[in-house]
Curated annotation (Swiss-Prot):
It comes from Lactobacillus johnsonii (strain CNCM I-12250 / La1 / NCC 533). This is Heat-inducible transcription repressor HrcA. Keywords: Repressor, Stress response, Transcription, Transcription regulation. Belongs to the HrcA family. GO terms for biological process: negative regulation of DNA-templated transcription. GO terms for molecular function: DNA binding. InterPro entries: GAF-like_dom_sf (IPR029016), HrcA (IPR002571), HrcA_C (IPR021153), WH-like_DNA-bd_sf (IPR036388), WH_DNA-bd_sf (IPR036390), WHTH_transcript_rep_HrcA_IDD (IPR023120). Negative regulator of class I heat shock genes (grpE-dnaK-dnaJ and groELS operons). Prevents heat-shock induction of these operons. It comes from the Bacteria.
């Protein structure tokens, strides 16, 4: 652990550097410290912090910048989230205070709001679908070989997919299959629709001479409804953190955040990784070296979970440069996760 003075100096350097993005010298630190300390003392303490691996010296300046270890110490022991300004509060309330037709629309808007407010890349995943129940399934013929499968759940979401059947299936056959499927599925939660239940439905369909392709499209639309949808906004902001023109890296980074499975793994929230200081923050921060891809070595990922009661939990996240102003960003995520949860609870309340 550091002495109280060393902690003050480290915190001052990090807060100044994340605002100016310029190396911080001893005179700047001396002028910003809340206690009177000589420039020589500050220089000596900065040298100690550098020896401990918490500060780094740049080639172009006599000032210091935080190292990854310095940021981690700051995040674990020193940070105090900042309350968001009234203007930001008003913008969040305004953008969320409009009618939405589906949960996914709210979650998608959440990612956009966070990206607009921060100029970083933002992610948002909706509440888990484990408790969501099926309220109806339909198949609508579009042509002699093409149909649309529609699955409706009790949270107001509608999933639909278009399928091409290998042979003509008449309307009466489709209606019989739909009635049988609804008898088996309506009122069931998505998480309870397992292979055993689907096999029972398949046996009934085969016994009645229904096309086996109907079961395939049912499985596809259920899988789609149960899968976690991750919304991303502000991908272009990733480019601002690249100082060179390495197009290969940029393309790989874009590909990484365009893969839903990779994103779910990256954004996955672990309560044990919440900030360990006294701020009681529910925001998790991972620095570049702590992230699973070398492409993210100059980035930090801030993740927060929000709860919508019995409807489950969702996740919001920000991906930005390591030298971001953490106090402001953590304060923003803390407030935003609560506002998003309230908006979703209001939405779900319409279906009681």
């Amino acid at each position: 652990m550091l002495t109280e003075r060393q902690e003050l100096i480290l915190k001052t350097i990090i807060m100044d550097f994340t605002q100016t993005h310029e190396p911080v010298g001893s005179k700047t630190v001396m002028n910003q410290l809340p206690v009177k300390v000589s420039s020589a003392t500050v220089r000596n303490e900065m040298a100690v912090l550098e020896e401990k691996g918490l500060l780094e010296k740049t080639h172009s300046s006599s000032g210091r910048i935080p190292s990854t270890a310095g940021y981690r110490y700051y995040l674990d022991h020193l940070i105090n989230p900042v309350k968001i300004p009234t203007s930001v509060y008003n913008q969040i309330v305004y953008q969320l205070d409009r009618p939405f037709q589906q949960v996914n629309e709210i979650v998608q808007e959440a990612a956009k709001i966070l990206s607009d407010l921060t100029n970083y890349t933002a992610f948002a995943a909706g509440p888990e679908t484990h408790s969501v129940k099926v309220t109806g399934f339909r198949i609508v013929p579009l042509s002699s070989h093409q149909v649309m499968a529609i699955l409706v759940t009790d949270d107001g979401n509608v999933k639909n997919q278009i399928y091409t059947l290998p042979h003509h299936t008449n309307g009466e056959e489709i209606e019989k299959a739909v009635r049988l499927i609804n008898d088996q599925l309506v009122g069931k939660s998505l998480s309870s629709i397992n292979e055993v239940l689907l096999k029972r439905i398949a046996d009934h369909l085969i016994a009645r001479g229904s096309a086996p392709e109907i079961l395939d499209l049912l499985q596809d639309v259920i899988k789609d409804a149960a899968s976690e949808q991750m919304y991303v906004d502000g991908q272009i902001n990733l480019l601002s953190n690249y100082e060179n023109d390495d197009l290969t890296k940029i393309k790989s980074l874009y590909k990484l955040i365009d893969q839903n499975d990779a994103l779910s793994s990256l954004i996955g929230f672990n309560p044990e990784d919440e900030l360990k200081n006294d701020s009681s923050s529910k925001v998790q921060v991972k620095l570049g070296s702590e992230l699973p891809s070398d492409l993210l070595e100059n980035y930090s990922l801030l993740t927060a979970q929000y709860s919508v009661g019995k409807y489950g939990k969702g996740t919001i996240a920000l991906l930005g440069p390591t030298n971001m102003p953490y106090s402001q960003m953590i304060g923003l995520l803390e407030y935003f996760r609560n506002e998003l949860a309230k908006k979703l609870l209001d939405y779900y309340g319409r279906f009681k």
